[in-house]
């Protein structure tokens, strides 16, 4: 006798720890293409929501793809709720966005989640650009972050250039960087981690990261590795979130995440690889 297939509506949904909303590439190690393996290394289940789908990053001679259509993007988010997958979500992680309309849609969606779950962690890497390349996102993204997303974040990980764009304040010195970061600590925000903080002040061969809270500011320092694959910020953000969910205080989580990135960079340099090679087992 042929048994009837079980009704999927009657079965328990897949438990999801992290909703990671970032870019996706067919070839390379950026956005969710690097973040998901890092999350999995912590034993976390991830719902990976693409904002753009590209063949590779734009620094290659050819690239195909683009932003996910807005109706698809909103549908991805809505269907996570419809499948009952959001009940146990511990963190929503945001990276590269395809444009201001996505930011606005995300703001509405996250606000709805936070209204139901005030303790929900929202970690945002406000991807805008960097000192070397300038702005490399769609026009209007700085205003979109300010208008729709910053007030929902529990934690933010801008680089120094992005911090200056978001706040309109100087970030040339570490003192200025810390002061600018503190202006983002309103609403739900508890911490701001500034990567590549005040680069003009670094000792030779070193890189500094500022970890800023309402009550404290710590400056972490690590070695500069002479290679520059894309995706290090995405890897750092995922590792940071993994360590935070494992119970580490924010400064220690940042230290451990930076160490993982350094190990990956050293492995990448030794292999002579043009794409980021993830480091070995977590410590």
UniProtKB/Swiss-Prot annotation:
Pathway: Cofactor metabolism; pyridoxal 5'-phosphate salvage; pyridoxal 5'-phosphate from pyridoxal: step 1/1; Cofactor metabolism; pyridoxal 5'-phosphate salvage; pyridoxine 5'-phosphate from pyridoxine: step 1/1; Cofactor metabolism; pyridoxal 5'-phosphate salvage; pyridoxamine 5'-phosphate from pyridoxamine: step 1/1. It holds the Pfam family Phos_pyr_kin. Gene3D superfamilies: 3.40.1190.20. Its cofactor is Mg(2+). It comes from the Bacteria. GO terms for cellular component: cytosol. Homodimer. Belongs to the pyridoxine kinase family. PdxK subfamily. This is Pyridoxine/pyridoxal/pyridoxamine kinase. The gene is pdxK.
